[in-house]
Amino acid sequence: MSAAAASHVHVACPNCLAQNRVDGARLAEGPKCGRCDAPLLDASVVELDDESFGAFTQRTDVPVLVDFWAPWCGPCRSMAPEFEAAARHLAGRARFVKVNADLAPDAAARFGIRSIP
């Protein structure tokens, strides 16, 4: 692999799921999707389902932190503001995603999630 190729990172678009090749030195500059122009590494928490979870996580080299949650879960709701704060703090360095375990049982099962919390 050439030095130029090694300096690029693949980032999945949270909007259209397209894989984007971004210069690693420019990750903090707010890169946008080449297909739909959506921000790739903003501070938002991305909500994914069974289908989009696999596509998103397989198309990105950026670390992804996943919150498997459920709307009826009190501790999950209590943690949500802290998860969002962490996403803002680490914007550009990691992607934070939420997966509703009730609506995405396949994604939850792949990671051994059997109960919430």
Question: Where do the PLM segments sit?
Answer:
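Thiol/disulfide oxidoreductase modules built on the thioredoxin-like
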Residues: A107-I116
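Cys/His-rich microdomains that often coordinate metals
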Residues: N20, L40, A80
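Short linker/helix segments within small regulatory modules
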Residues: V22-P31
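Cys/His-enriched microdomains
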Residues: V11, P31, P71
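A short beta-strand-turn-helix
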Residues: V45-V64
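Thiol-based oxidoreductase modules, predominantly thioredoxin-like and allied folds used
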Residues: L48, F68, A80-D106
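Short cysteine-rich clusters marking metal-coordination/redox-active sites
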Residues: C13-C16, C33-C36
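Short pre-active-site segment immediately N-terminal to redox-active cysteine/selenocysteine motifs
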Residues: D61, F68-W72, S115
